[in-house]
């Protein structure tokens, strides 16, 4: 059951169903229009605020590639749920917001730019490590489709199973076929057994990251 607008969330909710919380934050509210931001923008906003400690709305808008109006709405919704607070010095995460960020980081556990040619899908390529995500990977089609919807040119999904890095539908052992590519990923992200990695490419680095986030969310 989702909470009503204007009502904060419990620590248990922040530490539990954070994927459902993201969906709720992006939901349209009658009678107004649907917000111009999505779950990936909320995730990126939380990361940017957590990393900065405190940040102004204009700077956050630039970091997200959104207009200030959209960022104002996003921050209002985060504040309504007790996840952020705003002062003249900028906005910051509350203790509840920081708890949520740590929970997110426990699943979306690593990010890296990928320069390995075999794994490149665009001018800029971003890889995200999803802890425990391999169990939800079939052939990587769902991840690719979500990445493309987010603006990326494409995506490839890798999994670590039985100690081998694989690309479902392409190779069961990347190390034997493309050792330099496998080494690059293992060193950059350090996946463990049962983890998944999504790599997305785009002409713009922020779009590549949004594509990777959209793909990664299918594995949560």
Where are these regions (language model features)?
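Short, intrinsically disordered or compositionally biased N-terminal tails of bacterial proteins
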Residues: 1-21
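Short alpha-helical segments that sit at the start of domains
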Residues: 16-43
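Short amphipathic alpha-helical interface segments
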Residues: 39-55
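Short acidic, hydrophobic short linear motifs in intrinsically disordered regions
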Residues: 53-64
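Short amphipathic alpha-helical interaction segments
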Residues: 65-77
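A short, conserved structural fragment
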Residues: 79-89
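Basic, amphipathic "hinge/linker" alpha-helix immediately C-terminal to the N-terminal HTH DNA-binding motif
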Residues: 89-104
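Mid-protein regulatory/catalytic core that forms ligand/cofactor-binding pockets
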Residues: 119-218
């Amino acid at each position: 059951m989702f909470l009503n607008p204007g009502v904060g969330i419990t620590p248990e909710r922040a530490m539990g169903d954070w994927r459902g919380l993201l969906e709720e934050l992006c939901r349209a509210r009658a009678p107004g229009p649907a917000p111009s931001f999505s779950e990936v923008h909320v995730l990126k906003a939380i990361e940017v605020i957590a990393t900065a400690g405190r940040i102004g709305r204009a700077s956050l808008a630039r970091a997200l590639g959104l207009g200030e109006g959209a960022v104002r709405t996003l921050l209002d919704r985060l504040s309504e749920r007790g996840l952020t607070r705003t002062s003249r010095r900028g906005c910051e995460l509350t203790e509840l917001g920081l708890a949520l960020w740590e929970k997110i980081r426990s699943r979306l556990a690593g990010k890296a730019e990928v320069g390995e040619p075999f794994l490149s899908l665009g001018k800029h390529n971003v890889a995200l490590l999803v802890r425990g995500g391999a169990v939800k990977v079939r052939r990587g089609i769902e991840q690719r489709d979500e990445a493309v919807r987010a603006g990326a040119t494409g995506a490839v999904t890798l999994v670590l199973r039985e100690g081998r890095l694989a690309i479902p539908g392409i190779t069961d052992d990347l190390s034997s076929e493309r050792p330099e590519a496998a080494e690059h990923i293992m060193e950059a992200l350090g996946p463990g057994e049962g983890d998944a990695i999504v790599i997305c490419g785009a002409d713009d680095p922020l779009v590549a990251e949004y594509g990777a986030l959209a793909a990664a969310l299918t594995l949560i």
